[in-house]
Amino acid sequence: MIKVSVVGAKGRMGLHVVEAVNNAEDTQLALALDAGDDLTQITTDNTDVVVEFTVPSVSLNNVLTLIGQGVDVVVGTTGWTDEKLAQVKSAIANGPKPETQKVFIAPNFAISAVLADYFATKAAKYFESAEVIELHHPTKVDAPSGTAIHTAHGIAEARKAAGLAPVPDATETDGGSRGQVVDGIHVHAVRLRGLNAHEEVLFGNAGEQLTIRADSFDRTSFMPGVLLAVRKLAGDAPAGLTIGLDHFLDL
């Protein structure tokens, strides 16, 4: 049995993670901690893998503390910048088990979203134009979503490798309506009551358009991906920092 501790256990995602861990045949809940709880309760004696689902403002400190405890961590919190990732890598290198420490960060745990992202990177080189639209519930704290940013980076890298010119755009004034530009790709965020988590990637050429869309209607859609990551970290996942569930899928 894989002993799993959950940080952010009383949050929207954390509650689902606790339930998923309790219901899976090969995992058992070790500790369920939330804001204000002492993370040093989590040790390698009582925990094999930690799942961290909190908020961007505290996630980095949580992960650094857990690395210091020598436990492997699955992170579902978004808002990770290059600077924050560099701090995680440094903490691993200087932590108690630099050769075996595993930290996994996923922009999205929904299999549909991971596949949509993968398909988008494959399609990117064939189209002159590309834009990303992400749609979420109005209580989401970050915009654009980490998934959308990750998708935009992947599209940009594929376009660069193919030698494509920048996407065409004659806009001179927009007042912010053209969204955030991520590596030359426009990313738009919608926050609307009734939505959960959705993403559309639009590709265009003269006379044609391709739309790739992923919809998560309920947070239970993320749990198979979370459990996959837990099992991989408890098993054959490589040491160090891994980003993206695609690394654990046969793509």
From Swiss-Prot:
Pathway it works in? Amino-acid biosynthesis; L-lysine biosynthesis via DAP pathway; (S)-tetrahydrodipicolinate from L-aspartate: step 4/4
Q: Does the keyword Oxidoreductase apply?
A: yes
Provide the residue positions that the database annotates as binding (S)-2,3,4,5-tetrahydrodipicolinate: H137, G146, T147
Tell me the PROSITE patterns matching this sequence: DAPB (PS01298)
What superkingdom does the record give?
Bacteria
Q: Name one GO cellular component term.
A: cytosol
List locations, semicolon-separated. Answer: Cytoplasm
Q: Which CDD domains match?
A: DHDPR_N (cd02274)
Record's InterPro entries? DapB_C, DapB_N, DapB_N_CS, DHDPR_bac, NAD(P)-bd_dom_sf
Q: What is its EC number?
A: 1.17.1.8
Example GO biological process term? lysine biosynthetic process via diaminopimelate
- Write down the chemical reaction(s) this protein catalyses: (S)-2,3,4,5-tetrahydrodipicolinate + NAD(+) + H2O = (2S,4S)-4-hydroxy-2,3,4,5-tetrahydrodipicolinate + NADH + H(+); (S)-2,3,4,5-tetrahydrodipicolinate + NADP(+) + H2O = (2S,4S)-4-hydroxy-2,3,4,5-tetrahydrodipicolinate + NADPH + H(+)
Q: Which NCBIfam families match?
A: dapB (TIGR00036)
For this entry, the protein name equals 4-hydroxy-tetrahydrodipicolinate reductase
User: According to the entry, what is the taxonomic lineage of the organism?
Assistant: Bacteria, Bacillati, Actinomycetota, Actinomycetes, Bifidobacteriales
